[in-house]
């Protein structure tokens, strides 16, 4: 459970418990803020940032910051949400990459995820911004660092410029010349890290800054490092004048609340967050969207963006047409599940929806079933997926069960879920064609 889940559930529970069937008054405000403060501190939010949030919420709640007709519960959520946005940085801070080639200098301590983040950023800029990106390996000290970058670049089809153990400053200068000659839009410098900040590291980074004049200097910090990331950020910023911060591993631990404090304490924007190991698990940071998640409002904007980026519109339209014609089969289901999987895990997608009634265990069980169903369908021939009626043959059924390594019970569950879902879709289609409004809450495929 990531820090967002931990903090979100604690704050929502506190507000709901103290504000249910009530109006805002000094007593329930005091009790709610006491519990929210404890939630913030337990999530490792810096004490000064926590005080700022609590004091501002208290002033607004007691100072008549009330919308007519809204419940105490709605009011408190609105006020806390606004203060979270303010603490997180108010607005999204996009990269300054209009110059060609633009230089992005990645800095940070060893273990922060700097090298993998450099590759993720290259992938993001290429896919989303249509930029031609050159990765430059400059970490000549950590064994295998440059080789790691080369391998990562191969996975994302990103070219890597490296000169082995050559002086990093010289390599960076040569990389810039190469980028200009070969029409690259962005150059990402993967600099050396250290176990701790030292003068040797800072001198090398300062030389790189002077020679390459980067448009952006991004500090990569480990979101699981606690309050230490504030000190690290300040040390790097004092020496290099950072343009922003990238926080990694936000999905890894409940005590990641120091992230909430970075912008407030350092006045630097969080530009990106890493929420997984995949090379597509880096996202631009939007304070409002993070606050939405923390307050249980979901994150529809990010969900929509992921859908646009990963789902083939023509394929969806084709599937919808087949559904309305009653021709939907297991091949269609398999294809749609594969497209949804590109958007991320079911757990992450569900958290982007403004719903609170689905428990963590229910989501995990649904995720498990989807994985099992996909394995079973992968073990079928195209003919079997296109015409599920042939699966009634015992020999086919046994072959699929054996080939997939799943059980007969799981096979039957897939077929029953599919048949039930298909029947419900047909009923909905008939109602639409006859001009009646279907009850969509009863339709669809149940997992």
From Swiss-Prot:
Keywords: Cytoplasm, GTP-binding, Hydrolase, Nucleotide-binding, Ribonucleoprotein, RNA-binding, Signal recognition particle. GO terms for molecular function: 7S RNA binding; ATP hydrolysis activity; GTP binding; GTPase activity. It comes from the Bacteria. GO terms for cellular component: signal recognition particle. Composed of three domains: the N-terminal N domain, which is responsible for interactions with the ribosome, the central G domain, which binds GTP, and the C-terminal M domain, which binds the RNA and the signal sequence of the RNC. NCBIfam families: ffh. Belongs to the GTP-binding SRP family. SRP54 subfamily. This is Signal recognition particle protein. It comes from Mycoplasma mycoides.
């Amino acid at each position: 459970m990531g820090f967002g889940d931990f903090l979100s559930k604690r704050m929502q529970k506190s507000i709901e418990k103290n504000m249910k069937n009530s109006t805002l008054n000094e007593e329930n405000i005091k009790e709610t803020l006491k519990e929210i403060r404890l939630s913030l501190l337990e999530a490792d939010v810096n004490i000064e940032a926590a005080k700022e949030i609590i004091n501002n919420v208290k002033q607004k709640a007691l100072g008549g910051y009330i919308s007519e007709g809204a419940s105490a519960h709605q009011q408190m959520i609105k006020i806390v949400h606004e203060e979270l946005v303010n603490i997180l940085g108010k607005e999204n801070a996009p990269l300054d990459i209009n110059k060609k080639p633009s230089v992005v200098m990645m800095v940070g301590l060893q273990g922060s995820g700097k090298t993998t983040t450099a590759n993720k950023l290259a992938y993001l800029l290429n896919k989303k911004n249509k930029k031609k990106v050159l990765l430059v390996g400059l970490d000549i000290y950590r064994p295998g660092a440059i080789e790691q970058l080369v391998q990562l670049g191969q996975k994302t089809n990103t070219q890597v410029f490296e000169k082995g153990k050559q002086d990093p400053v010289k390599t960076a200068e040569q990389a810039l010349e190469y980028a200009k000659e070969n029409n690259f839009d962005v150059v990402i410098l993967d600099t050396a890290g250290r176990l701790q900040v030292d003068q040797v590291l800072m001198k090398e980074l300062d030389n790189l800054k002077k020679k390459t004049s980067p448009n952006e200097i991004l500090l990569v910090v480990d979101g699981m490092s606690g309050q230490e990331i504030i000190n690290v950020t300040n040390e790097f910023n004092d020496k290099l004048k950072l343009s922003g911060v990238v926080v990694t591993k936000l999905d890894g631990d409940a005590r990641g609340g120091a992230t909430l404090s970075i912008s407030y304490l350092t006045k630097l924007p969080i530009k990106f967050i890493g929420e997984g190991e995949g090379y597509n698990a880096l996202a631009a940071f939007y304070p409002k969207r993070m606050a939405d998640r923390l307050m249980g409002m979901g994150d529809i904007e990010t969900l929509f963006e992921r859908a646009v980026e990963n789902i083939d519109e023509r394929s969806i339209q084709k599937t919808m047409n087949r559904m309305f014609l009653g021709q939907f089969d297991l091949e269609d289901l398999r294809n749609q599940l594969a497209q949804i999987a590109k958007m991320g895990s079911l757990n992450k997608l569900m958290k982007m929806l403004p719903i609170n009634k689905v428990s963590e265990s229910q989501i995990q069980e649904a995720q498990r079933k989807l994985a099992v169903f996909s394995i079973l369908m992968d073990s079928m021939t195209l003919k079997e997926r296109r015409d599920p009626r042939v699966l009634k043959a015992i020999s086919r059924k046994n072959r699929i069960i054996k080939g997939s390594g799943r059980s007969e019970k799981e096979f039957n569950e897939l077929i029953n879920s599919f048949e039930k879902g298909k029947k419900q879709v047909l009923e909905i289609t008939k109602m639409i064609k006859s001009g009646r409004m279907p009850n969509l809450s009863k339709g669809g495929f149940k997992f």
